[in-house]
Structures are given as structure tokens and as C-alpha cells.
């Protein structure tokens, strides 16, 4: 045959010696589990939102890639934060699309008189250690 473009023709033939296995349909079981987990997720974020208001969170720590998704699920543009502190100097002065909060490079002065929410979910452990070491008030969103 004469082919034009970048196409390739491949033909397969099923081996007749292989027995067919029936797939078990776990859809209803999996669907229930997904719905249950999603409901728990929504409840957890609602509690976190209440905690943010109650504790008067006014800054974030950790300008990770997931911050916009985190903010989306919190149903906020993070305007309640004065800034997000990050250890990466290249991120200083940057902003996330559709979020109000500016990223600032780590400086001891930025930590005082602030109540932080850890915003880099993948960095909760090292950020918690750093803030604990300095006796800075913070909320771990994963607890």
C-alpha cells in the first residue's frame, strides 16, 4: 500500500491459545468510596476554613506549585494573607494567577507578629520544623 503523511499501519491477531478473563466490575464499590472520600475532603476543608478565620491567619509559608489548587479548594483568593514567605529567592515578588497574595523571600522580620498557614503542602514537615524552631505561630493544613 501507498501511505501519505506520518501514518503507519499495524495489524494484530489475537493468540487463540490465551483464555479470556472476565473483568470484575467494581464501579459501584469504587464510586461509593470516591464519594465518601470526597465528602471527607470537603468537610476537612470547611473545618480548615473555619480555623483560618478563628486563628486570624494573616500570612502563608511556602510558595509551592499547588498553592492555587489549595486556594481553590479553600474557596479563597488568599487575600486574607499579607504575603506568602518562600525560601526560593527567584519567587520573590511573584504572584499566582487569580490570587491576591504576593510572594516574599524569607526574612526573619517577615515572621514576627504573623500567624502562618503552611501553603506548600508538600513541604509541611520541613516548614513546620523551621517555624517551631523560631516559636512562630502556624497552622498545619494537613492535621
Language-model region placement:
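Hydrophobic, well-ordered beta-alpha structural blocks that scaffold small-molecule cofactor pockets
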Residues: 7-143
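Conserved S-adenosyl-L-methionine
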Residues: 1-4
Amino acid at each position: 500500500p501507498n501511505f501519505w503523511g506520518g501514518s503507519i499501519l499495524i495489524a494484530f491477531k489475537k493468540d487463540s491459545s490465551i483464555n479470556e478473563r472476565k473483568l470484575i466490575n467494581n464501579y459501584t464499590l469504587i464510586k461509593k468510596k470516591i464519594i465518601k472520600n470526597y465528602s471527607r475532603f470537603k468537610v476537612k476543608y470547611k473545618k480548615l476554613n473555619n480555623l483560618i478565620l478563628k486563628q486570624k491567619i494573616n500570612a502563608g509559608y511556602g510558595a509551592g506549585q499547588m498553592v492555587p489548587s489549595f486556594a481553590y479548594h479553600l474557596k479563597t483568593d488568599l487575600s486574607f494573607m499579607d504575603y506568602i514567605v518562600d525560601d526560593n529567592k527567584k519567587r520573590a515578588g511573584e504572584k499566582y494567577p487569580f490570587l491576591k497574595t504576593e510572594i516574599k523571600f524569607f526574612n526573619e522580620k517577615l515572621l514576627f507578629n504573623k500567624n502562618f498557614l503552611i501553603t506548600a503542602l508538600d513541604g509541611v514537615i520541613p516548614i513546620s520544623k523551621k517555624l517551631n524552631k523560631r516559636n512562630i505561630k502556624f497552622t498545619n493544613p494537613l492535621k
